[in-house]
Amino acid sequence: MNKKKYLRFIYLFFLATSIFSCIPQKKVIYFQGKQKDSTFIEQEQFVYKIHPRDILHISIVSPDARVTSFYNIQQTPSQNVNPGSMYINGYIVNDSGMVNIPVIGKVKVVGYTLTEIQTILEKIVREQVSDATIVVKLISYRVTILGEVRSPGMHYMFNERFTLLEALGMAGDLSEYGNRKNIKLMRPKEGGMEIVHLDLTDEDLLKSSYFYLKPNDVVYVAPMKAKIDRNNLVIATTFFAGLSALVLIINFIKSN
């Protein structure tokens, strides 16, 4: 292969690789479908029920703080409210589905919603403190986002409802190489792990029960083939750059 043909081959190689490593717009658009001015999608109602090893914040208060102080955990001093301090000061649901509250004792909470737990505790506490107010919050709502997102890691949400879109938003959204059609949701189950494949380009995802995340879920965003092609292009570029330099040196030596 003479010099002219060689350079032509190099040019065509880079041109072809660049074209095939480009990402079509259709691959990065969420919830694709026919464009409408307004669309209503009915969603499945999601209410989280407490599981073993969840962590709850339970606060029992009344106008007379001295009366209800005995019902609460002695708080560990902390200047900042963070997941670590809330873990220390929270109630961990044991494997039997119970939490152990001062004065009250063990109360079954597994299988109940936060509102139902609040009602149960109100009934117990108000037999002794008629004007008591009970606040129950879930503080172990954390999910892990991995793969092709801009800010992978563990993210916390202090709310009863946490959607896949909210989780991806907290992770900085998918990168340009995140495969919208290949989202893997890993959900811990008793005795194992449930794995579900989700497609962000499909509007029907909004109707799915998996649109709502649960504590300890792991979301993995797979890369597009274009990222692999890009990485291969970098390797090929380095190789051919070195090869081109070598050919030029050899031609220079031969011409002198």
Where are these regions (language model features)?
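Ser/Thr/Pro/Gly-biased, low-complexity, turn-/loop-rich segments
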Residues: 2-4, 22-256
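Sec-dependent bacterial lipoprotein signal peptides
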Residues: 1-20
